[in-house]
Amino acid sequence: SEDGQAVVEENGYISQGNTGAFKSTEAEGKIVVAGSSSVTPVMEKLKEAYLAINPNATIEVQQSDSTTGMTSAMEGMCDIGMASRELKGSELAAGLTPTVIAMDGIAVVVNHNNTVDNLTSEQVKEIFTGKLTDWSAAQ
């Protein structure tokens, strides 16, 4: 919702644009949200905003990691899974539907003594997958 995206932006994430105004249905009951530790801070803020207009609802946010969140959603242990990555093919095949609520920036930093000063996204990927194992190959 527009309100949710405002919360996303206020907390330093990149919003996904205006998705319209949220209209409270005065929901009741409990929702369990589980997963990514990097999504948890913004989810806690979204929880606060939601509960401010739906005081009879209960939201439990369980912090772990993306895979645990997706597994918990697939197994019915939580209502909403949080992931800070794209869903895997197996997760999509299991029926999970992704909804992007925000994007976060990731920075790669090298020691100031390192002569490498301009890495491409592909080179970073190759470093972390082990394809590039020597800095000289990244220059």
PLM feature spans:
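Flexible loop/hinge segments at secondary-structure junctions
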Residues: 1-139
